[in-house]
Amino acid sequence: MMRELDDETFDAAIAAAPVMVDFWAPWCRPCKAIEPILDELQGTVPVARVNIDEYPEIASRFDVFSIPTVMLFSGGEARGAIVGVRPKAHFEKWLAEVLPAGELDGLAAQGQPDA
């Protein structure tokens, strides 16, 4: 299960190691469709999520206008985003392109982002 982030935990969660953040809403069917894919990817990179209905200011900070939007953060900075439903292979390829090879190695052992 993905960790839910809020106003108090978001900045700490993205501050250091790479983490994927899923911007979603409970009423969003495409968001529900990618949830199993993101759960599987937690073995590769930590994944957390932000409910945009409850925390719209976080989504606004990163210009999230459509959901699902999955953003990769590292060192507190957004490194890229995928908008919409994509297959697992698309996310894996994207991670390999966005993160340096050494940065992806060992992330699986870290588990969920700390806050």
Over which residues does each language-model region extend?
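Structural micro-motif
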Residues: P56, F62-M71
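Typically the conserved alpha-helix immediately C-terminal to a functionally engaged Cys/Sec
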Residues: P30-G43
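Hydrophobic beta-strand anchors of alpha/beta hydrolase catalytic cores
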Residues: M20-V21, V47, V70
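Conserved acidic residues
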Residues: N51-D53
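N-terminal "domain-start" segment that seeds a small globular fold
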Residues: M1-A12, P46
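Non-catalytic, surface beta->alpha helical segment in thiol-disulfide oxidoreductase systems
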Residues: M71-G106
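Short active-site neighborhood of thiol/selenol oxidoreductases, capturing the structured segment around
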Residues: I14-P26
